[in-house]
A protein has these predicted regions:
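Alpha-crystallin/small heat shock protein
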Residues: 1-110
């Protein structure tokens, strides 16, 4: 799927939270976007603007544009995201539905 780029991990950080980490070396914060569309988390990376102006004698570090999609389960929301040391971390939180107890009054027959 999508040639495996960029590589990513999904880890559970608590009973109700998860973290998706993508290896996005070479991409700045302005080159990345995160959206949620119809329960799909979509991470996109655009090639940095100065890529076209550079003449590479050897090109071993990939910085091509990408799109990665993750299906979010019901009740899972994006809690935040940050980028550091070439890794993009997307934190997810699963909301635990509150248990609502309703007492039904029993009336006498009509």
């Amino acid at each position: 799927d999508q040639n495996g780029y960029p590589p990513y991990n999904i880890e559970q950080t608590s009973d109700t939270s998860f973290r998706i980490t993508l290896a996005v070396a070479g991409f700045g914060e302005d080159d990345l976007s995160i959206t949620v569309e119809d329960r799909q988390l979509i991470v996109r990376g655009q090639s940095p603007a100065d890529e076209e102006e550079r003449l590479f004698l050897h090109r071993g570090i990939a910085a091509r544009q990408f799109q990665r999609s993750f299906v979010l389960a019901e009740g899972v929301e994006v809690a935040g995201a940050n980028s550091e040391n070439g890794l993009l971390h997307v934190d997810l939180k699963r909301s635990v539905p509150e248990k609502i107890v309703t007492t039904i009054k029993i009336g006498k027959g009509a």
